[in-house]
Amino acid sequence: MHDAQIRVAIAGAGGRMGRQLIQAALQMEGVALGAALEREGSSLVGSDAGELAGAGKAGVAVQSSLTAVKDDFDVLIDFTRPEGTLNHLAFCREHGKGMVIGTTGFDDAGKQAIRDAAQEIAIVFAANFSVGVNVLLKLLEKAAKVMGDYTDIEIIEAHHRHKVDAPSGTALAMGEAIAGALNKDLKECAVYSREGHTGERVPGTIGFATVRAGDIVGEHTAMFADIGERIEITHKASSRMTFANGAVRSALWLKDKKNGLFDMRDVLDLNSL
């Protein structure tokens, strides 16, 4: 990797998250914006990435091909769609580039492809790059170990009307954190929908509820409910910049990593707590 700075490329540069990532990359010390990418045929190709993000001229033109910029970046930051991310993953694996993956909605095969690639390149793969959310995940592990076997656990998440996957990747990560703390498999204890005559709640399950409305950036609550009391642990995001800053921070953290699969808790050293 480049000696002086980590050079990042931003996939999906013209999207809501892409523009925030460009701003974060331009602002963070030790990071240089090396490339910005949009899909082939986009009217944004050729435009200045900094101006696109509202951050002023950056001197980096938006491109439609990773091949065209393969010598301009060390780490690709990708918050796009699973099919696009997996194509980018294959390129980065072939050319020895690190990746920060914030894309959600992968199936099991997609997740396995990421694990396989991490044997050769360094990857930070997380459902949520907010510092607060990752502290939340740690708190959920602690709460589950104390209360999980005695309470009804529900996870409620809300996002903007444009989000295409449900439950959110963060909600699933919350479920995984709780299930893992209880030595359970989330696939076997999760309840993703309730409709009609459902009967009484099945003990030991983890319920999920989803809201899609307006411009909600992201809200997540885990509820541990007993008779007479309940604990709710909530995170609310008010700006995508919290995710963008975390993703760029992750790219910087990867600077000296050759290979391996990491998440945001590794970046923040939360696993040592």
Curated annotation (Swiss-Prot):
Statement: the UniProt record of this protein carries the keyword Phosphoprotein: no
Catalytic activity: (S)-2,3,4,5-tetrahydrodipicolinate + NAD(+) + H2O = (2S,4S)-4-hydroxy-2,3,4,5-tetrahydrodipicolinate + NADH + H(+); (S)-2,3,4,5-tetrahydrodipicolinate + NADP(+) + H2O = (2S,4S)-4-hydroxy-2,3,4,5-tetrahydrodipicolinate + NADPH + H(+)
UniProt-annotated binding residues for NAD(+): G12, A13, G14, G15, R16, M17, E38, G102, T103, T104, A126, A127, N128, F129
NAD keyword on record: yes
A molecular function (GO) term: oxidoreductase activity, acting on CH or CH2 groups, NAD or NADP as acceptor
Pfam (any one): DapB_C
Active site as annotated: H159, K163
A GO BP entry: lysine biosynthetic process via diaminopimelate
GO cellular component: cytosol
Enzyme Commission number(s) from the entry: 1.17.1.8
SUPFAM superfamilies: Glyceraldehyde-3-phosphate dehydrogenase-like, C-terminal domain, NAD(P)-binding Rossmann-fold domains
Pathway it works in: Amino-acid biosynthesis; L-lysine biosynthesis via DAP pathway; (S)-tetrahydrodipicolinate from L-aspartate: step 4/4
Major subcellular site: cytoplasm
InterPro entries named among the record's database cross-references: DapB_C (IPR022663), DapB_N (IPR000846), DapB_N_CS (IPR022664), DHDPR_bac (IPR023940), NAD(P)-bd_dom_sf (IPR036291)
Subcellular location(s) of the protein: Cytoplasm
Binding site for NADP(+): R39
Key words of the record: Amino-acid biosynthesis, Cytoplasm, Diaminopimelate biosynthesis, Lysine biosynthesis, NAD, NADP, Oxidoreductase
Family to which the UniProt record says this protein belongs: Belongs to the DapB family.
Quaternary structure annotation from Swiss-Prot or TrEMBL: Homotetramer.
Function summary: Catalyzes the conversion of 4-hydroxy-tetrahydrodipicolinate (HTPA) to tetrahydrodipicolinate.
Protein name in UniProt: 4-hydroxy-tetrahydrodipicolinate reductase
Organism, scientific name: Klebsiella pneumoniae (strain 342)
